[in-house]
Amino acid sequence: MTSVAPLVSGVPSSPGQARGPVRLVRTVDDFARMRPGDVLVCRTTDPAWTPLFRLAAAVVTETGGLLSHASIVAREYRIPAVVGATGALSLLGDGTTVIVDGTLGTVTGQTR
């Protein structure tokens, strides 16, 4: 995968790399917008958000740390996660394809 400079960065909390379209999920009302392979981008997660992890290729949250809900559940599902990525909801465009690197803690745009 070829990539450019990170769009956002944060705490690497679940290792691996995944590519997919950004899905901005701000409230439970947005849950139905998630599709398999989407990159879940949100402020934070709690147990009510757990079903979304089955669909997500990766998770990016604006808050949290290594022991946050998003980090723990992402590791359980073995999907990459970057938490504490300040500004992710405003910097990442809904539907834009990104590469999430949960080992480095970066989210980059994809080049052709």
Feature map (PLM): residue ranges:
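Non-catalytic, soluble scaffold/interaction modules
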Residues: 1-112
